A protein has these predicted regions:
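Short, Asp-centered acidic motifs that coordinate Mg2+ and/or phosphate
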Residues: 3
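Amide-donor transfer/coupling interface in amidating biosynthetic enzymes
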Residues: 66-162
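Cysteine-nucleophile active-site neighborhood
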Residues: 10-81
């Protein structure tokens, strides 16, 4: 394959354990040095250094930062489930077909904590949530592009064309 997609639904510690047991952790790290990689939802979270979901678990370390429980303002509940709009932050090829205000679909309780330079787009859910992150040829969508209609398909098509 000339690109990799790391999907994920579930808990960070379990997912990392499964990658480790399958011998895939180092394979993914090595492949990410030479191929475009996209993490989706939990797959995005696993790109970071570590997560604090159910304790502390090391991630893949491909994007600097951590993953922490969200604390939204305005009594918003978690998990954050539903449609939310994107606000562009840093230039990113994956967002070429996306406009500020385009909606994508989220399902998550944890969010990345990383330097703003690694965030291509945020969403607002009572806090600024990194929605699309990047570092070199490694990208991550906290939202589900495959469930996000025209906007999500545009992002996936752009990734496929890299």
């Amino acid at each position: 394959a000339d690109k990799l997609i790391l999907p994920g639904v579930g808990a960070f510690p379990d997912a990392m354990k499964m990658l480790d047991e399958a011998g895939l952790t180092e394979v993914i790290k090595e492949q990410a040095k030479k191929k475009a990689l996209m993490g989706i939802c939990l797959g995005m979270q696993m790109l970071f250094d570590k997560s604090y979901e159910f304790g502390e678990t090391e991630g893949l370390g491909l994007i600097p930062g951590t993953v922490e429980l969200m604390h939204p303002a305005n009594d918003l509940v978690i998990p954050h489930i539903g449609w939310n709009s994107l606000e562009k932050n840093e230039p990113c090829k994956l967002l070429e077909s996306v406009n500020d205000g385009d909606y994508v679909y989220f399902v998550h309780s944890y969010a990345a904590v990383t330097d703003s330079k690694n965030v291509a787009a945020y969403c607002d859910y009572g806090m600024k949530v990194p929605a699309l992150v990047m570092s070199g040829n490694v990208y991550g969508c906290q939202f589900h592009p495959e469930k996000s209609g025209k906007t999500g398909l545009g992002i996936l098509k752009t990734f496929a064309s890299l």
